[in-house]
């Protein structure tokens, strides 16, 4: 979680880029990086396609369905390997999602996001998901250790101070109304 412009999306992109660089044996943008082998799936910048009749929300649903198929392939398909003992071992999926279901109303977004995260938690995945929806942070208490909350906090005074540092917990401060009020004060 975190306020607008606090660094959530930039962190997700940095994580994805560094993961790909590391898996390719290239230098990464970090002092140190320790990773495991995953199949990577990201959804960062969903766009509509009006020429094909696909609204923004529909594009989001299509992408989430692609993620579910991707996870199933990792668990059951060609990416599922046989171990020395003869057991099937799934190659886990690393998911990076930025603000899912933002193309719908607040209540549907919350309920749909919760339902999707409950479904994805049953898959062999690890992931990082950015959200403004603080209600979703309650899933940390409900999902037997499957979810953990981290945030990018800001300090609100006469202005906004961005720390750009990730920390354990849920963001306490939000800045959208604060920033809008700054604009409205000018007029």
Feature locations, PLM:
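ATPase nucleotide-binding head domains, primarily ABC-like/P-loop NTPase cores
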Residues: 1-187
């Amino acid at each position: 979680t975190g306020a607008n412009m606090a660094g959530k999306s930039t962190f997700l992109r940095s994580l994805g880029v560094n993961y790909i660089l590391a898996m390719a044996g290239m230098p990464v943008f970090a002092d140190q990086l320790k990773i495991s082998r995953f199949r990577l799936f990201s959804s960062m910048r969903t766009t509509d396609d009006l020429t094909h009749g696909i609204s923004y929300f529909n594009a989001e649903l299509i992408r989430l369905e692609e993620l579910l198929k991707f996870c199933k392939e990792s668990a059951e398909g060609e990416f599922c390997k046989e171990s020395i003992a003869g057991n099937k071992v799934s190659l886990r999926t690393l998911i990076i999602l930025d603000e899912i279901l933002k193309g719908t109303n607040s209540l549907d977004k919350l309920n749909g996001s919760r339902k999707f995260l409950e479904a994805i938690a049953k898959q062999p995945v690890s992931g990082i998901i950015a959200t403004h929806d603080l209600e979703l942070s309650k899933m940390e208490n409900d999902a037997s250790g499957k979810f953990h909350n981290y945030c990018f906090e800001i300090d609100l005074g006469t202005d906004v101070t961005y720390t750009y540092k990730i920390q354990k917990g849920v963001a306490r401060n939000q800045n959208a109304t604060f920033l809008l009020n700054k604009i409205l004060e000018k007029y």
